A protein has these predicted regions:
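C-terminal interaction segment
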Residues: 2-70, 77-124
Length: 124
């Protein structure tokens, strides 16, 4: 279970399904002997949400916009019902590009050298 929380612009929190946390962020918290390793205010390299019937609309209409405002580098929405992945990637000009994947191999920018077979994400 993911208990990491990402602080939003209004001071509340979201708990993504999966998040890649930079090593430097974890090390900084350890150096400060912080007891709170699960709250991050800075932009994350990769945030993943899994679409569900109960929260799918909220994930796309609200959380996606907040992740983009934070400047998260790559945001994925896995849609298990139609077996697709929508990826938003932050570009140098500050805008996000959107790509929809239905098959093949995905290479997350946040994890150089990692290749993920899309079909494997939807195996039971």
């Amino acid at each position: 279970m993911n208990t990491m929380r990402l602080r939003t612009s209004d001071g509340s929190f979201y708990v993504p399904d999966v998040t890649v946390v930079p090593r430097a962020s974890v090390q900084a918290a350890l150096d400060l002997r912080s007891t709170r390793l699960d709250v991050y205010t800075e932009a994350m390299p990769l945030v993943v949400e899994v679409w569900s019937r109960s929260t799918g609309g909220y994930d796309v209409e609200t959380k996606l916009l907040e992740y983009q405002l934070r400047g998260d580098a790559e945001i994925w929405l896995l849609h298990p019902y139609d077996r697709t992945l929508t990826a938003w990637r932050l570009q140098a000009d500050g805008r996000y590009t959107e790509s929809i994947y239905r098959e093949g191999v995905i290479e997350p920018v946040a994890l150089p050298g990692v290749r993920i077979e899309l079909a494997a994400l939807f195996e039971a």
